[in-house]
Amino acid sequence: MAKQQIYQQRVLKLSSEYILWNKKDVHITLQEARDDQKLIPLFDSTAIRMIDIINEFHRDIACEEMDKLKQELKEIRRKPKSHENKKRISEIYKAMDDIQCKMDYVTVVFKSKEDFDELNKGFKVNGIEYHRLIGTPNGVKKSTIIYCAVKNKYDKFMYQELSRRLNNNRDETKELVPAKFEAHKALACSASTPVSTPNGILVVDDLIVHFKDKIIYLNDEDTDEPVMKEIDNADVELNICDGGGLMMPSLASRWSEEMHVNYLMGACCLRNSFCKGVVSTFDFQAFGREVAHCDTVTDVWGNVYNINNIELILTTSMLKLWDSYSSIEDYLNKCINNDFTFSITKVYPNELEEERNLNYQFIQSYNLSDEDIMHLISPTVSEIKDVLGGDYYKTLLFMKGSVDENYNGAEDDNVIKSLMIAPELLQDTYIINRIHNMINKKIDDAKIGTLKIKGNYCVVIGDPYALCQHIFSMGISDDKLGLLKAGEIYNKHWNDKQVNQVVCFRAPMSCHNNIRKMKIVNSDEMSYWYQYLPAVNILNCHDTLCMAENGMDTD
């Protein structure tokens, strides 16, 4: 399955006030919606793909039609203006809207709970009735809920059929927490790209490790204010693979090609029905041959498989409702029947950055001396001095690094392009003023802790070697699991730089205890088994790093 080059899709985004002002019976044309910024772009998702399937809407034909319409539009615009050409341009735009706009799917932004209660009774847009479909976790934070057409213009009972498919024929006798179930079901609305089905899937229990460590215990059960107590030798339980799974290099290679990635992906964020998490590339078949000396494994339902017939391993923390199905075959068959597919929301890079900007939270708890501060700000000050000194190449790098979504993106991009074409523009008054504005912003940001440092943001995964020891039931004691010891992490980027210690931060931070100094380690064994993971932090399963980083997990 090749990565789909889908055209831009759009949906209506209405406010609850607007719908209620129209007495829950809105009449609006697409052009009016566009003019009022009520027609918004929407990334492709499983839910949108299902809507197209239910409507018997063929995307390949639609893509060809869109290409033809765009080409015709270009050709007409080259011709002299005329009434006929103007009329045809309008017809082309209408035809493109019919393809792009998904009128079965409407998002509503709520002003109040009362509005929410009222609109959940139903409302109409252009004569079509809509019912509440789902609230995604991110959408709920922004008071936004997704509604679906009850019966659409194609006479399809969309709400009923889409709701049925999203439930994926799960065992409805299983008790669920409503809020969690809503979040699990909403995974179908994540922006994603479909990929091919793996050749063999294994679902296993999470790896739960127990050890003793020093902790700070907070208890607010019996008092108005929390009581803090330090415990030196506390019992700690850690899920080392919370939201994490494994894929064979063969599967990673195939998915990399399907996602048009020009390297072997080390990790990606995966979706399917009630399934979410990060899968990392690890040759668990080789592990079976060389370490476990075994090729049979047992899944969470008690079924036995040959590991050489498995390409993807999911954990129970990834497949949220695994116990609502009788086996992996039962789950996959129901996914096929309801048009669920595996899809990828993000492919992680194979190289990490050399430099990043600090967040003020990361340094606010430090008691820094003047000498420490001078050392910390040195890279930022040097960069500003280089630009003020007129260094052409460093000015270009500075400007590219200063461009983000909050700073005149398109205009600054044009300035950079102009400088690349004509370096002498560095002496132009307008360019000089523009650079000075950027420098002033850089200085203001530096004052609140946005400082350039050697570092990067990096995804974390639990030790896949330890997970495989668990999968193959090797009987290894908790304190011997994995290749990493307490206080250690593996990171190829820092190993290649011969760095032996890093400081780990994760926003948002609440106290200095959220900061951890970790050893960067390596060995021939680690280099071999972690060879497909060049740009991730591999965590040990013997310390409280995840707890210290505000409950960090691996998905």
What are these regions (language model features)?
Residues 1-552:
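Conserved small-residue
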